[in-house]
From Swiss-Prot:
GO terms for cellular component: cytoplasmic vesicle; extracellular region; vesicle. Keywords: Cytoplasmic vesicle, Fertilization, Secreted, Signal. The gene is EC1.4. Involved in the regulation of gamete interactions during the double fertilization and to prevent multiple-pollen tube attraction; mediates the redistribution of the gamete fusogen HAP2/GCS1 to the cell surface after secretion upon sperm arrival. The keyword Secreted applies. The keyword Signal applies. PANTHER family: EGG CELL-SECRETED PROTEIN 1.2-RELATED, EGG CELL-SECRETED PROTEIN 1.5. Coiled coil: none annotated. It is found in: Cytoplasmic vesicle; Secreted. This is Egg cell-secreted protein 1.4. InterPro entries: EC11-15, Prolamin-like. GO terms for biological process: double fertilization forming a zygote and endosperm; regulation of double fertilization forming a zygote and endosperm; regulation of protein localization to cell surface.
Amino acid sequence: MASNTTFLFSTVTLLIILLNTTVSGRDLPAESSTNIAARLQSGGLMECWNALYELKSCTNEIVLFFLNGETKLGVSCCESVDIITTNCWPAMLTSLGFTPEEANVLRGFCQNPNSGDSSPAPSPKIV
């Protein structure tokens, strides 16, 4: 009976030492700034909220873009899409109800140098 208790005690002690060594041996990532004042002063958070607010105002343009194929997204709408997908939360558009494919189409359209114009494409020249 004493040998069973000794074996159990030794096993539990060894397990605790092994777990303690494993947990204490890994590097933890450096803490990001948890100070809310510092995050608010950085400007990034406000830029994201402003872009989200602007995106709300161009929802009709985006819906027409997907329903009718109209390529008349305004410059401010494209800037908002670009800010949200690159600087803020890449999945934010999907959380607003857009599929990942639609978010990629919007991002691709807005990153195109000719996007954001409301003017139609020039007609081809006849030679």
